[in-house]
């Protein structure tokens, strides 16, 4: 991992003093916090999203580094939800260690309606690298909208399925997982190949993503059908998170927006800033 920005390193140093926070969680929190403070918060503010005094929810929060960065922008309330109990436990420990107040809960946005206290409650909702795992994109957006205030903001980021590693083949932990564009193989060959993965759960995940195949075009249609206002769309050759993970600067690919096919193959990230109608 490249050298972290000073502000991020201070947070990582704080949680390093805790024996109950492992190196895996420190790593993921560190790059998430860096992404939130160096890119996501400045981007949202540049688009007119008010973070100070805002109620903010991240769906699929992981180790909640992004939430921590947004909390430091003066948010009134931050809530992280995830399907994994370990992620929730880690987030609670990390927030305690860095002295930030947050609420965390296990919640499935597809099968569970939001609790009354969350319904129509949030000014800002984030879905980072989550929506591509949800089987019905439009329905998922509608469920997320239940959490949002009228006029609330939704920030969505995902790797298009046909981008070099959009099939999440890195999960396979085998030689195949190191190769780009394996999702372009015919179904019989692709299926035979990914079933050689070491872990059954990873086989299931890659298979599910194969069924969903979330593309830029599919995402645009889902946004339109869900009646969300599209405020901004950004495409990237190199994702902003690569700066934190690998030291590679973000490179935009917005000129591909109007080139069907090529945009799906070449853009490693698509991000959307959306707004719920008043």
Question: What is the predicted function of each stretch?
Answer:
Residues 1-120, 124, 141, 238, ...:
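Conserved N-terminal segment of class I S-adenosyl-L-methionine
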Residues 5-7, 18-27, 31, 135-143, ...:
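S-adenosyl-L-methionine-dependent methyltransferase catalytic module, highlighting the catalytic core
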Residues 131, 145:
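A conserved short alpha-helix in the GNAT/GCN5 acetyltransferase fold that borders
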Residues 127-128:
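A short beta-strand submotif of the Rossmann-like class I SAM-dependent methyltransferase core
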Residues 111, 132, 163:
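Active-site micro-motifs of SAM-dependent methyltransferase domains
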Residues 58-61, 116, 151, 179-183:
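Short, low-complexity intrinsically disordered segments
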């Amino acid at each position: 991992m490249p050298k972290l920005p000073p502000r991020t390193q201070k947070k990582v140093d704080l949680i390093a003093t805790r024996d109950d926070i492992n190196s895996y969680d420190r790593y993921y929190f560190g790059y998430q916090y860096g992404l939130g403070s160096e890119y996501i918060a400045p981007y949202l503010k540049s688009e007119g999203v008010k973070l100070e005094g805002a109620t903010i929810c991240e769906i699929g929060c992981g180790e909640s580094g992004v939430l921590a960065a947004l909390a430091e922008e003066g948010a009134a309330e931050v809530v992280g939800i995830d399907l994994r109990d370990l992620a929730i436990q880690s987030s609670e420990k990390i927030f305690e260690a860095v002295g930030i107040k947050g609420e965390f809960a296990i919640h499935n946005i597809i099968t569970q309606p939001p609790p009354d206290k969350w319904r129509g409650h949030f000014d800002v909702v984030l879905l980072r690298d989550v929506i591509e795992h949800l089987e019905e994109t439009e329905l998922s957006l509608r469920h997320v909208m239940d959490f949002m205030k009228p006029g609330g903001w939704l920030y969505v980021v995902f790797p298009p399925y046909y981008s070099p590693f959009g099939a999440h083949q890195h999960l396979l932990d085998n030689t195949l997982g190191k190769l780009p564009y394996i999702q372009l193989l015919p179904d019989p060959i692709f299926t035979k190949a990914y079933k050689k993965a070491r872990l059954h759960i990873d086989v299931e995940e890659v298979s599910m993503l194969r069924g969903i195949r979330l593309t830029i075009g599919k995402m645009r249609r889902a946004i339109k059908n869900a009646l969300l206002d599209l405020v901004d769309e950004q495409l990237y050759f190199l994702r902003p998170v690569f700066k934190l993970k690998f030291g590679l600067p973000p490179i935009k690919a917005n000129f591909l927006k109007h080139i069907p096919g090529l945009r799906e193959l070449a853009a490693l990230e698509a991000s959307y800033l959306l707004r719920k109608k008043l």
